C-alpha cells in the first residue's frame, strides 16, 4: 500500500470494531523545515518532503508504486535533499546507494538500476554520478567520508577510459544501453556528454590523492 487506497475484504458475518493502518518506511525522520508566508508553498514543501521519504526503503527509488528500482539519475536528485531534510540515519541509505553503484558495476561499466536484474547503462547518468555535481561528491561534501572516494577512484577511471576522443579533443559519444539525456526535444546530447565527461574527469582527478 502506498497511501492511495486501502481495500479490506471480509465476510458478512464479521463484525467490524475498528479499521486502520500502520505507516511504515525507512528508519529516518524529517527534521529539516522550510516555511513561507504562503500556505500553498508550505503545502508543497510538506508534500515534497514526504515524497522523498516514501521513495526511501531498502534503496532509493523513482516512486514506490510504479518503479522501485534504484536508478542512479533519481538518486542524484534525491541525495542533496537528504542532507537538508533527514536525520543522520538517512546517510546510511545514501552510502549504500553509492556502494551499490560502484560494487555492482558490470566489468568496467557503471550501470543504473542496481541492485536488480534489469540494470542498464545510461552513460549520461553514470557520468553525472561521478561528476563534481553527482551524488558521490554530494555525499562526500556533506559527510567528509573518504571511504566512498576510495571505492570510486579506480572504477571511475576505468569507466572514463571507455570513451575515445575525436581529432578535436572532444569525446565520441557512447550509446550504452540507453542514450538518454533529457525528455522532450532539442536536447544537445554532444554538448551534455562532453560537459558531464569533463566534470567527471575533474572530480576523479581531485580524488586521486586518496588512492
Question: Where on the chain are the PLM-derived regions?
Answer:
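Flexible glycine/proline-rich, aromatic-decorated loop/lid segments
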Residues: 168-182
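Surface-exposed helix-capping loop/turn segments at secondary-structure junctions
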Residues: 59-60, 169, 206-211
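Active-site neighborhood of glycoside hydrolase catalytic domains
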Residues: 189-211
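A ubiquitous short alpha-helical element
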Residues: 118-124, 185-192
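Short N-terminal micro-motifs specific to bacterial/archaeal maturation
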Residues: 69, 123, 140, 167-172, ...
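A generic structural signal for solvent-exposed, polar alpha-helical segments
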Residues: 32, 77, 184-186, 203
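Substrate-binding groove/exosite segments of carbohydrate-active enzymes
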Residues: 1-8, 12-164, 179
